[in-house]
Amino acid sequence: MTPTAPSPLVWRDDGLPQSSLYGDVYFSSVDGLAETRAVFLAGCGLPERFAERRDFVVGELGFGSGLNIAALLDLWRREKPPGGRLHIFSIEAHPLSRDEAARILAHWPELGEAAQVLLDHWPGRARGFHRVDLPGFDAVLDLAVMDVVEALEAWDGLADAWFLDGFSPALNPAMWRDEVLAAVGARSAPGARAATFTVAGAVRRGLSAAGFEIAKRPGFGRKRERLEAWRPGVRPVAQRPETLAIIGGGIAGAALARAARAAGLEVTVIDDADAVAASGNPAALVTPALDAGGGPRAALYAQALSRAVTLYEAQPDAVLAREVLQLAAGERDPARFATVADQDLFEPGDMRTLEAEDTRARLETPTPALAMAGARVIAPAEVTAAWAGPVVRRRVAKAERDGEGWRLLDAAGEIIARADRLALAGGAAGADLLAEAPLRPVRGQASWTRGHGAPATAFGGYAIPTREGLLFGATHDRDDTQTNVRSEDHARNLATLAKGLPALAARLAGSTFEGRAAIRATTPDRLPLADLREDGVIVLTGLGSRGFCLAPLLAEHLVARLLDVPSPLPRQLSHLLKLTRFDSPVTRSRL
């Protein structure tokens, strides 16, 4: 069984769920909720310690049915301090299905809305990190579906409290080994508390070696004792920024605005253009870059796609089509598609291969394909308008320090905005605000027509539905920065369409096309720049043609970095996006 396979449940005669992997029950036969409240909540000094920080961080080993988290959410909503936000990080190598969790949580109807919000946003089973919104609770959950040590090493947070709730050390000793407890210690803030139901000697020694002081307490139910642990020290309280100015109103800037507002920041978005790059087209693809290697780059795109689709689906009228067919372009593609479809980075069924005859019925084209059920076509204008909010339509010529914050000026030296923090998200148009960033402009022209339609398809080019017809394209011309629409580029797009979908191209021959040309920013390794500069400025650019896939997750990562709270992005993936990876002095600025 792979780490992402669901853990089989055996329902005992007494109604308790038991893991067939470890032979242990998921909660006490006396009362699982009462045990959670006594062992983990009270054991970590909750709710009293909620008042210590505006952003309170709880880590958990063993997500299981979500019972501990539902109980935590119930307590948090009743006792949270004004303006407080709860960040939860949990690890589960063998995730349960939503239906299994619902059957378990039904034992405690008193958890009510706390259990329901968790079930309504139940995380998937794909390997990696899952960001889960918990609306109405001022809380967010990051679930790591992977090995416990791998997850702890990947997480960049520091917990104020730990729920150590793996299966019994006698039945699952790997969860309690010294390496795990040392990693827990390394991911604990000064003054952190940890609690567990076991007082096994190996656990006590491991926690002590990890820097915790420990004490036995009276146990719950049939257990005579339980364990509480704490780290010495007091976590310093850093001054939190309250305002953020974002230069750039395309998908990068809009995603940053959404993430920042969700975190409680006041946001000003500034852009001198009415529509930015591909954000101004009537439709946009949300697809990952396919990587048969299954390494960090593949994991980045898989996680980004999952998060982007979750957010687009929550936005009214944003989604135009669900599922995108990627057609094979060469003899090796079917085998590559099969490898991608087998990757555990995607949810079961999200990637599946199609034989040539399977696509003929849909597209009149007998070509093997990869059906990407998790991909989308969206209406970019609706998304960027909703996420960015009101946009200040002025051009920023200069930004300068204003005490601890920033002051943005136009060409005449007039102040456009002031803010505590600054974000650069202008794509190719904002490249002049970064010193020697390795950004290269690429011009792309898309074409569209009314009254024709087709399933969303990619084939080197692409053809996707709009609200009124079909969009197809696009050209890809490096170092061309002109945005005039060209008739010859409509012809090029039609020729590309003919290679992938010849029957559709034949029907469109002789039609009149509308179009739009925009300039994207790209990097030498075709991965974006998503980092904080040494001066604290957010940089999100170089998204290329995958902006609608990448921007939502990367924006949340950058806002988390800005506020010094846990990021939804694993460490090894964030390292792919650093400004310094090209050995270029991009941490200096012309601002």
From Swiss-Prot:
This is tRNA 5-methylaminomethyl-2-thiouridine biosynthesis bifunctional protein MnmC. Keywords: Cytoplasm, FAD, Flavoprotein, Methyltransferase, Multifunctional enzyme, Oxidoreductase, S-adenosyl-L-methionine, Transferase, tRNA processing. In the N-terminal section; belongs to the methyltransferase superfamily. tRNA (mnm(5)s(2)U34)-methyltransferase family. GO terms for molecular function: flavin adenine dinucleotide binding; oxidoreductase activity, acting on the CH-NH group of donors; tRNA (5-methylaminomethyl-2-thiouridylate)(34)-methyltransferase activity. The lineage of its organism: Bacteria, Pseudomonadati, Pseudomonadota, Alphaproteobacteria, Caulobacterales. GO terms for biological process: methylation; tRNA wobble base modification. It catalyses: 5-aminomethyl-2-thiouridine(34) in tRNA + S-adenosyl-L-methionine = 5-methylaminomethyl-2-thiouridine(34) in tRNA + S-adenosyl-L-homocysteine + H(+). SUPFAM superfamilies: FAD-linked reductases, C-terminal domain, FAD/NAD(P)-binding domain, S-adenosyl-L-methionine-dependent methyltransferases. Residues 1-232 are annotated as: tRNA (mnm(5)s(2)U34)-methyltransferase.
